[in-house]
Amino acid sequence: MRNTMSRLLPALLLVLALPVAAEVRELQWSDLIPPGAPPPPPPVALHDLSQLADALEAEAGPAAMQQSPAAPVVEALDDVQVKLPGYIVPLDMSEEGRVTEFLLVPYFGACIHVPPPPSNQIVHATSELGVKVEQLYQPFWIEGPLRVEHASSELAEAGYRMDAQKIYFYELD
């Protein structure tokens, strides 16, 4: 009986711990801004086609300045298992042509076609599996442990880091 109990107890503890370990908190971009901090400015949109030539010329120039490179972050999110939707801005690729290091941003074109959003609206992520380059024009869910940690890249400053354990297409429910 004692031998059976000594085997059963660790198994029971493991089963009870699984729901806690597997719990993933779904975040929205507003959750990355601390209460009382200023909201991010709206993204710059190019709706006037008469400005298209100027915009294309600006693409060839130096990168636009980031809106707030040291924006305040939410410390309580450190080491929380999360999932966050967004767009991928590639930083590094594998030999197989998959993006393995990237910035996750809230809207398409951020850091590339328009100035980068504040640092608390950018997550610097790495992934062993990566994402195919041809899939980068659509939004994704990124899932993994979020760290409140500053990261610099050639495109922007990020207020958060993540080891992206799961990457999958964003679909409306």
Regions found by a protein language model. Give the residues of each.
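OB-fold and OB-like single-stranded nucleic-acid-recognition modules
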Residues: 22-173
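Bacterial N-terminal signal peptides that target proteins for export
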Residues: 1-9
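N-terminal signal peptide c-region/cleavage motif recognized by signal peptidases
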Residues: 17-21
